[in-house]
């Protein structure tokens, strides 16, 4: 796979198709992608105010009436009051149907700005500029938008494909190491469900896999985005196949909710991946070596592979509200082999308990 620092484009073949442009120093591409717009709103997280202002000024120099809208960081920005605030500001500045939004930030910014774009005037264009690894390989690609409520994570949302996605790898240099590592959980997920070469690259040199200066991480980003683009093209609205992108997320979302979103999404998904692998192994669907490989790869990256031993009853309660459930029946994405995702519906409580026991952290109780 091409890994030079020249821009690489991955096409997401939905209707209409759109590009995910991967490279460095890509902000200059934004003007051309947006085209002729009267007004543009740049939705950004606080730490990116300076970059957002650079974008705003650049657009203003082109004659665009450009505005910055700051939203809270991380999961604090993914709720109805924040969306209501965005609607209010979009109305005040007069964003019309021919205008556009730009999201600048991590996955939470992509989710909430995308939801605002999907619902404002029943849909306006948006370009995503993800600045975290998680945003690049997951949230910004595929058109899923959403917010959190007391009922659960991402249960309120809409499908709204972006006009384009700009993945500027240079922004990874600004991430705290633990934020970069957390994003690797989604990369590992892509490897297990569809592209084992991702796993080989990480195992060969885990340290290089999280080095934003190297070519290994650049290739991992490209490969993970390509996996998601292929799945989204085959099943845009998550009628069936796209569910495989939720591998590890059933327990992961429950952990996030139990932790009141203080855990990073990737950290929770990492534990969820180990749990899903144990479920499949104990159900006789996944070989021991591949199940064990989950734990070794995630651990090598510095991601968590265990959780509070006493938490299962509460986690089961939260998982019951998972969007993959059907008629109250709990469903998991599992593996029937490497890069062979399947489903496990209505697992016996004893199986759930045994799988959880395999990752329970007695010290966290």
Curated annotation (Swiss-Prot):
Zn(2+) binds at residues 186, 249, 265. Its cofactor is Co(2+); Zn(2+); NAD(+). It catalyses: 7-phospho-2-dehydro-3-deoxy-D-arabino-heptonate = 3-dehydroquinate + phosphate. Keywords: Amino-acid biosynthesis, Aromatic amino acid biosynthesis, Cobalt, Cytoplasm, Lyase, Metal-binding, NAD, Nucleotide-binding, Zinc. InterPro entries: Dehydroquinate_synthase, DHQ_synth_AroB, DHQ_synth_fam, DHQS/DOIS_N, DHQS_C. NAD(+) binds at residues 73-78, 107-111, 131-132, 144, 153, 171-174. Catalyzes the conversion of 3-deoxy-D-arabino-heptulosonate 7-phosphate (DAHP) to dehydroquinate (DHQ). Belongs to the sugar phosphate cyclases superfamily. Dehydroquinate synthase family. This is 3-dehydroquinate synthase. It comes from Mycolicibacterium paratuberculosis (strain ATCC BAA-968 / K-10) (Mycobacterium paratuberculosis). The lineage of its organism: Bacteria, Bacillati, Actinomycetota, Actinomycetes, Mycobacteriales.
């Amino acid at each position: 796979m091409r890994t030079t620092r020249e821009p690489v484009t991955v096409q997401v073949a939905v209707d209409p198709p759109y590009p995910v442009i991967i490279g460095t120093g890509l902000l200059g591409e934004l003007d051309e992608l947006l085209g002729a717009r009267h007004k543009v709103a740049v939705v950004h997280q606080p730490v990116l105010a300076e970059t957002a202002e650079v974008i705003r000024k650049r657009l203003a120099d082109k004659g665009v009436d450009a505005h910055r809208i700051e939203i809270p960081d991380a999961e604090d920005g993914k709720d109805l009051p924040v969306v209501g605030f965005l609607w209010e500001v979009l109305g005040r500045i007069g964003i019309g149907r021919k205008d556009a939004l730009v999201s600048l930030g991590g996955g939470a910014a992509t989710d909430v700005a995308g939801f605002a774009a999907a619902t404002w005037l029943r849909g306006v264009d948006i370009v995503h500029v993800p600045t975290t690894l998680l945003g690049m390989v997951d949230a910004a690609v595929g058109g899923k938008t959403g917010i959190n409520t007391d009922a659960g994570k991402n249960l309120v949302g809409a499908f709204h494909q972006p006009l384009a996605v700009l993945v500027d790898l240079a922004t990874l240099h600004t991430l705290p190491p633990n934020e970069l590592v957390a994003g690797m959980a989604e990369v590992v997920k892509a490897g297990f469900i569809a592209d084992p070469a991702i796993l080989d690259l990480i195992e060969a040199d885990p340290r290089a896999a999280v080095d934003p200066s190297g070519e290994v991480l650049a290739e991992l980003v490209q490969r993970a985005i390509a996996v998601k683009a292929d799945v989204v093209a085959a099943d845009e609205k998550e009628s069936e196949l796209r569910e495989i992108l939720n591998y590890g997320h059933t327990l992961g979302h429950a952990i996030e909710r139990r932790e009141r979103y203080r855990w990073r999404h990737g950290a929770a998904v990492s534990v969820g991946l180990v749990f899903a692998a144990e479920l499949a192994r104990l159900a006789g669907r996944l070989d021991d070596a591949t199940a064990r490989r989950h734990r070794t790869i995630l651990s090598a990256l510095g991601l968590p592979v265990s959780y509070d031993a006493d938490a299962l009853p509460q986690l089961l309660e939260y998982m019951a509200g998972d969007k993959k459930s059907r008629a109250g029946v709990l469903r998991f994405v599992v593996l029937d082999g490497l890069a062979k995702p399947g489903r496990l519906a209505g697992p016996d409580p004893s199986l759930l308990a045994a799988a959880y026991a395999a990752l329970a952290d007695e010290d966290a109780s």
